[in-house]
Structure formats: structure tokens, C-alpha cells
């Protein structure tokens, strides 16, 4: 029993690093470092135990070919071929990753070799792969493998032999006009193949394809350049807004734009569209969480569909039109299930195709997601229903929105304005606003929308009554009423007399007495300001403690802004705002003006030199200024090396003998004494003297203790 318990404990043991990784993934499911730890752990476990981790991995990163390949290879290693084929069915069509497709071909080649129909299945697999991934810049090996496979197929009889030659030639000719790395080698192999079949026909066959090959080779060079630097194995994660990510996004868009520019210079719009969409598919493997890529891909398909329809190619036009809808469907079904932007674009696209039932299903599908705010969805849904089916259909959607407890006040505003502008019925709009006021009377944004509507109708009495109702009913908290009071004052300033203006100002001051105590002048600004014109300068407004509640509301980028009283002024100049982080004093910066050919010992850029030690400063003051010295400049390193090697005499007598030539005792480390006469003679020689001629005529033999030669010999050793 104890042994069984120990076995269970061992089976349940989880390494500490795995626990930490799991904790990180709870906080951020896209933490790649944590996933790397789990992947390494799974690779060291039996597949039955690791399968759960792999399933989580591909569920989190469904577009990552690298992760799918890891999962499939683990199943292949365990010989679970039935599971392998199911995995390929799940990912192969959706993930156009070159390594994943090579893994698929390798799997078919290794596991189907003993079947009677192996040759047919393998040929179908290669054709399928080239159709899907043949435009890949790294697809050369697949083309070569297919050709070698066809060459190796046994052909009995002349008919079968001709069939094989035709099949090989067809693949060669397709590959030689497809831009990719190593296209030159494929072309050379094709030339040899044709010459091996019939040298007389080969020349014409090659000439017929030569122009297209040269064009493809040129494009392949550009293709390789534009793809350089792209991280194509990166898993797709939500936008991180990092410089590295921005750089990758920019590079991907340049690649797509390059494909759109038609580098092959072909007139086949279908081929252009297929190449551009292949670029989009490659991009979406890495940037699948970026809605703009999905939208641009669908837009491009829609444009291509219209272009083909104009040319009369209705079949491909319909194909691309349906594929555009499929792009939207894939986006909202996989990585961007809650992205309203793509749902709305998808709905508009189907509306343009007059498929109204499909549009209804799209909106209802989004509304069925429980953990979203459906307000904007209902608003767009109402607008669609009114456009496509009339005002009555829009009212039905509004009724449905009122019954949904998740909706907010914006739905009432939209419905009221829709009634006013579309049915021209002010009374219906007024009733909707009144109905909403009962429910959202404590939300200043809704009250302001109602006020704007009444102001638009120029109904002064009703507007004034609304102001009084809202401000005196007690439904609106005082801390939220700041903008309502400001709008009331602006309203009276536009249409009321001075007495009514002063009355509103007094009531407003009473409502915010604690805030504006001692700052009565700040309230005076609101009486005279108009739009962005103020009766004081920005610094004066700041000194008054003035705050503009309308600007404060616009500046607050939050879903439900709350305008709370504050003694801190909101209106500030950019100059008055202090940075939130320390900044250098740019006035003290030295312009970057590097010296041209700076002499040794000086910095190429002025400034940045360390202060001179005090003792050296005293010495420098005693020396003549630098302008007095015109050269020659001493090589300091060599001079210091000579000083280091010199042996200084210990006594005065020894020094005198060396100077007077009494004894040649000037020595260098390990080199013995030096001939002093030669040194002195060389030292006193006149500069104008023709030393080269004298040395050639007389001093043929070098000195016995030549320092220079001794040093050179020492270096050689």
C-alpha cells in the first residue's frame, strides 16, 4: 500500500518552475516565457500526460504553425497516427506554415509507403501542398521533392514513360516561374532534364520559358529582400504596443504592399489576388490579433471581386466575394470573438450583398456574448434595421434593447434622434427622452443629450423647465451636476436677461460653495467665455483657480466620465504643465559638432573631458599656451616606452662618465651597453646634412649595441 501511495505522489509531483509558469499564465495567458517552460516539460513527458498541455497550447495559439508541429511530432513519435491525421485536419487548411506542411508531406511519405495507392496519395499530397503553400519563398525543397518523387515512379511502356515526362515537365515549368529562393538551381535542373530527353527540342522548350523565368528570378531577389527581418515563427498575441511590434507590423505591411504593386507585372488579376492573399495569410499567422489586418484583407478581396466582375469573370468574382465573407467569419470565430469593429464591418459587407438575414444573425451572435457591453451593438443594429427594413424594424430592436439589462442610456438617445430625423415626429422623440429620463436621470451625459435636443428645437421654455427639474429633483448627485450648471449658465447667457444670468450664477455658487469659497471671480469667467475664447490669459485663469468642466470631460478618456468638483484648475498651457518624468536641461547641452581629424588625446566631440588634477593645473599655468607650439608632435606611447626601458645611473660619477664618453654605460634592459659615441654623433648631426650619403659611404657596419636592432630581434623571438 505504501508503495502505491508513493507512486501516486510521484505521478502528482509538479516541478516548482511549472507551478510558477502556471501562475504567470493565470495573470497573462499569452506569456511566452511561461509557455516555453510548459512546452519543455511536456516534451519530457509521455504523450498521454503531455497531450493536455499541447491542447491548451494550440487552443491559446491556434495560428502558430510551430506549436501545431510540436504537438503533431509528439503524436507521431508515439505512433498515434489516427490522432495525427485528426490534428492535420484541424490545422492544415488554416495554418499555411511551411514547416507544418513539410511535416505533413513527411508524414504521408513515411506512413503511406506500404499502401497500394501510395503513389496516387503522395502525388495528391504534393499537388495539394503546392497549391496552398507553393508561393512560399522557402518552398524550393517541396518542389524538388515532388520532382524527385515523380522521377522515381516506375513507368512501364512508352505511354507511361511519356506520362511521367509530362508530369515532371509540368512541375518544373510551374516551379521555374514561381519566385522563391534557389529558383536558379531549379532552372538549371530543368535545363538538364530537357536536354536529357531530347537535346533538339530542349532549346525551344527552354527559350519559351526563359523570359518568364528571368522575370521570376528578378522578383525572387526582391521577395527575399522584402521578407528579410520578418519574425515568421512568432506566435500571435494581442497588440503589445512595443517598438519591436510596431517595426514588425510595418515590415509586414510593406511586404503586403509590395505584393499589391504586382512585382510579376502580370495581367492576370486572379494570380495577383492569390499572391496578395497569401501574403495576408502569412501575416495573420503572426498578427492575428490585429483587426486592421483582417479588415484590409477582406477589403482587398471585395475590391478584386468588383474588378473581376467588371471584366466579366463572374465565377472568380463570386469566389472572391464569398472568400471576403469567409475572412470576416474566420476572424470573429477564432482570435477576435469579441471585436465589435469586425462584427460591424462584416454586417455592413453582408448588407451590401443584400443578405439581410445574415446580418441579423451576425448582430444576434454578438449580442449573445454575455460579458460585453451591448449598447453600441444595439445602436448599430437599430441603424441597420431602419436602413434595410424601415423605422418599424428599428423600433423592434429598440424594444429588445430596453429589455436587456446590460444596455446604457445611449440607446434611448439613438432611438429618440432616429424618430426625430427619420419619422419627423417630435412627440415620439420627446416621449423616448422622457422615458429615458426616469431611468437615467442621474447620468449627466443623458441629461445633456436631452438638453441639446430641446435646444435644437429652440424650445426655450421646455429647456428651462428641464434644467429646473434635473437640478432640483435630487436625482442628480451634486458632484455630477457641474456641467449641467455650466450649460444652464450658457443657456441663460444666450437667451436670458442679466437678472436671470445673475440668478443662475448665485444658485451655482451656492451649490458649490465649498469649492468656490474665495474664488467668486473664477465663476465670472463662464459668463463671458465663448467656445474656446476666454476673457483671461491661461496663466491668469490658472491663478484664479478656474476649471473648464467641458474640457475636463473631453480630456478624460474613460467610458463613463464623472465630472467631480475640484479646486485644481483643468485649463493649463502646455508650458505650465510639468513633465511626469525627469528631463535633462536642454539649455546646457552641447551641439553635436565632432571635430574633423581630432589630434591624439582629444575627444572628437567638444566637452565630456574629465577635469585636470590640481597639480597638473599648476604646471599647465607655468607652461606657454598651446598656440606657441607648432610641432613636431611626439608619439607619447613610444616615448614613455623608451623612458621605461632606460637605466638611470645610481651615482653622479657614473652619469658624468656616460655623458663625457668615459664609459659606455647607457644601457637598455637585457640589451647591454650602448655605444655612446654613436648616440652623441647622431644627436649633434645637423638637420641639413646629407646623412644618407654619409652612411652609405662610411658607416656600413652597425653599432655593436644598437638599441633599435636589439628591440626588433627581441620582438622576433
UniProtKB/Swiss-Prot annotation:
What's a Pfam family in this record? Suf
One term of GO molecular function: RNA binding
**Does the UniProt entry include the keyword Repeat?**
yes
Q: Name the domain of life.
A: Eukaryota
Entry keyword Oxidoreductase: no
Q: Which residues carry this modification: N-acetylserine?
A: 2
Enumerate the SUPFAM superfamilies for this protein: TPR-like
Annotated HAT repeats reside at 45-77, 79-110, 117-152, 163-196, 221-261, 271-303, 319-352, 354-387, 458-494
**Segments of this protein annotated with the region Disordered:** 684-705
Tell me the compartments it is located in: Nucleus
Query: What keyword terms does UniProt attach to this protein?
Result: Acetylation, mRNA processing, Nucleus, Phosphoprotein, Repeat
Q: Which GO terms describe its cellular component?
A: mRNA cleavage stimulating factor complex; nucleoplasm; nucleus
- Chief place where the protein resides: nucleus
Functionally, this protein is described as follows: One of the multiple factors required for polyadenylation and 3'-end cleavage of mammalian pre-mRNAs.
Quote the subunit structure annotation.
Answer: Homodimer. The CSTF complex is composed of CSTF1 (50 kDa subunit), CSTF2 (64 kDa subunit) and CSTF3 (77 kDa subunit). CSTF3 directly interacts with CSTF1 and CSTF2. Interacts with FIP1L1.
Q: What is this protein called?
A: Cleavage stimulation factor subunit 3
